[in-house]
Amino acid sequence: MSIIENTEDLGVLRFITAGSVDDGKSTLIGRLLYDSKAVLSDQLSALSRAKNKRTVGDELDLALLTDGLEAEREQGITIDVAYRYFATAKRKFIIADTPGHEQYTRNMVTGASTAHAAIILIDATRVTVENGVADLLPQTKRHSAIVKLLALQHVIVAINKMDLVDYSEARFNEIRDAYVTLAKQLGLTDVRFVPVSALKGDNIVGASERMPWYAGEPLLDVLESLPVETQAHDALRFPVQWVARQDGSSADDFRGYMGRIESGEVKVGDVIAVLPSNRTATVAEIIAPVPGGTASVAHAFAGQTVTIRLAEDVDVSRGDMFVTSGEPVAPAKKLEADLCWFDETPLSPQRKYLLKQTTSTVFAKIGGVKQVLDVHTLSHATDRHELKMNDIGRVALTLQKPIVCDTYDAHPGTGAFVLIDEATHHTVAAGMIREFSA
């Protein structure tokens, strides 16, 4: 029986790894997979046969376990997020492996959008220290700012390559103190620090004998113990993605509304409101995936993809949203949002954009750039009128027609969107709604 089969159903932790180029991220992921026995025998055989300039003697180059991503980067292929899966006796994990290069910041946003936690990797040898004060790299600040923008629940700062600084407690403390200052500036509250050597395996799965001064848990133990908050008990948000008929014909009496429950829960017999029409109806049936197919269930909750059938005949189409009846939810046309800009062509009020939020797509006009984050100083420039690639800024938008939304902090599923350039069809930005009004 595999380790995954032995795992109790304690839920899944999704986390991202973020670090500058050559911080040892691939080796860290490889070490987690290898030491948690998540490497298949054929992968292990290939690893033992592979030798390159980074290996010494019988050492395994664990970074090769993620070298598919590196090979793509070297060939100039557009990099997407690579997902890795492993499990221990306590938990299942999904790693969103994002590239470290600055030009791939957009891919980190993609990976972080569904994550519960982030591992921020810092190379202990690349941080300059003057008079006991460490100067963190700009990418570390950028990654941390994105983690804050996307409201990830937990941050683990893995200070790597401790073997190359003689496992120095002083160096660890200098970097930790610098990051504590950064975290306070950004408003990150749940931050944990682990000194590691991914290459040697120190403090990855087991405690390191070479750092007796560190009294905390190794990295894997921290990951296993992180609490995961769900939105199952929040207000219902169910964007309708598809109107389904049993046989596809217009004469078919069956009509089900398919989509993903972004937050809250729904039960058979609940009275829901359909927005934006505000018509009410009763949930007659919920159909959900089960092993071997689908089945009617009495109850469904956030994160599940389901089909809902209503008792009353009401007009529902793609882009509508089911909410709890009586809840004061007003569609919005004016938004204030934080944008992470992805495209080489800067944001411009003169260009036409489409805003895609849940299952709705509407035209959006840029009202102006209110501020842009300087990742070097963590200050906000208010004299900028455009966003360039990898910029993070606060922007005002006016929509052609209203959408049903929430602030990102309240409901990430309905508070997030992407912007699409109408002319190029490029996805140019990810947005997080901070304020909205009619």
Where are the language model's segments positioned?
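Active-site phosphate-binding and catalytic loops of NTP-dependent enzymes
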Residues: 2-3, 53-56, 67-79, 129, ...
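P-loop NTPase switch module centered on the Walker A-proximal segment
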Residues: 3-106, 115-128
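C-terminal effector modules of nucleic-acid-centric enzymes and ribosome-associated factors
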Residues: 11-18, 164-167, 181, 312-438
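Residue-level signature of catalytic and energy-coupling elements of molecular machines
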Residues: 22, 28, 47, 76, ...
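Short acidic, glycine/serine/threonine-rich loops at helix termini
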Residues: 44, 130-135, 167-171, 204-209, ...
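G-domain G4 guanine-recognition motif of GTPases
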Residues: 47, 123-125, 153-173, 193-211, ...
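Conserved Switch II/interswitch segment of TRAFAC-class P-loop GTPases
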Residues: 91-94, 98-104, 113-173
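Conserved catalytic-core segments of large NTP-driven translation/proteostasis enzymes
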Residues: 173, 180-345
